[in-house]
Regions:
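Juxtamembrane cytosolic interface motif at the C-terminal end of transmembrane helices
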Residues: 15-16, 39, 80, 111, ...
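Cytoplasmic membrane-interface regions of multi-pass membrane proteins
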Residues: 78-87, 117, 148-164, 217-219
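Juxtamembrane "helix-exit" motif on the non-cytosolic side of transmembrane helices
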Residues: 44-53, 109-120, 181-190
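Interfacial "cap-and-anchor" motif at the non-cytosolic start of specific transmembrane alpha-helices
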Residues: 167-219
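Alpha-helical transmembrane segments
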Residues: 10-14, 146-149, 208-217
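Alpha-helical transmembrane segments of multi-pass integral membrane proteins
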Residues: 15-42, 93-96, 129-186
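Juxtamembrane membrane-water interface segments that cap and precede transmembrane helices
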Residues: 117-131
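Individual alpha-helical transmembrane segments in multi-pass integral membrane proteins
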Residues: 1-9, 22-108, 132-141, 192-207
Length: 219
């Protein structure tokens, strides 16, 4: 299921970029999809890599994609979608949205504050308590920001079609937040593998729903 989720995530990134003219909204969503696909791929890698190899390559994907690419992509997507492109790429916004995940991922790569515990049918990625203080706000905080940002923007919309469209995107983002927290925040550390794998596919379904809703009549 993880391999299927990875393939679909990659395809969604390609699909969004291939429909109509490219813009930074599409690029940021594609970044999120590809990073999410690589993040999901860590489970599949555990099958073919040794523990020593996984501690290097698997953890690297977790840091770079799960703690950097995913939150940056999804936060930029919501910001660009709701505030427009021209006033988004300034020093203030980039420093708030991009720098914290990058710093967090850099800390992970340099200090590698994680331990990989192997169990019969999978793996559990356990972060040291001090690192969770960075990990949880960065990964899930940026997802909550994305859903909340779209929700706040909806209050000022008067066009029914646009409200419906933005509402669908908000619901998709909210679904990703809830599913991600259960599948990656709770199940991963508890060793609930079926929930983890089901969460991979459910997140991809929400990604597809957002892509479809965003691209509807926008090409």
């Amino acid at each position: 299921m993880s391999i299927l989720g990875t393939i679909v995530s990659f395809y969604l990134g390609y699909y969004v970029l291939s429909r109509g003219e490219k813009n930074w909204i599409k690029i940021s969503f594609a970044l999120y999809c590809v990073s999410g696909g690589l993040f999901i791929l860590t489970r599949a890698l555990r099958i073919v890599l040794t523990v020593e190899q996984y501690e290097i390559y698997g953890a690297t994907l977790v840091y770079l994609c799960g703690m950097c690419g995913v939150p940056v992509g999804i936060a930029l997507f919501s910001r660009l979608l709701t505030h427009g492109e021209e006033d988004t790429f300034n020093t203030k916004i980039l420093s708030v949205i991009v720098v914290p995940p990058v710093v967090c991922a850099f800390i992970g790569l340099v200090f590698n504050p994680s331990e990989v515990i192997t169990i019969e049918i999978g793996h559990v990625q356990v972060f040291e308590p001090w690192f969770q203080v960075l990990y949880v706000p960065i990964l899930f905080g940026w997802m909550i920001y994305a859903a909340g940002n779209v929700g706040i923007m909806m209050r000022d919309l008067t066009d029914d079609y646009l409200r419906k469209k933005m509402g669908g995107i908000r619901n998709g983002l909210t679904g990703i937040v809830v599913t991600g927290f259960i599948a990656y925040g709770v199940a991963t550390n508890m060793g609930w593998y079926n929930i983890m794998f089901a969460g991979d596919l459910l997140v991809v379904m929400f990604q597809a729903y957002i892509a479809y809703t965003y691209l509807e009549e926008s090409v």
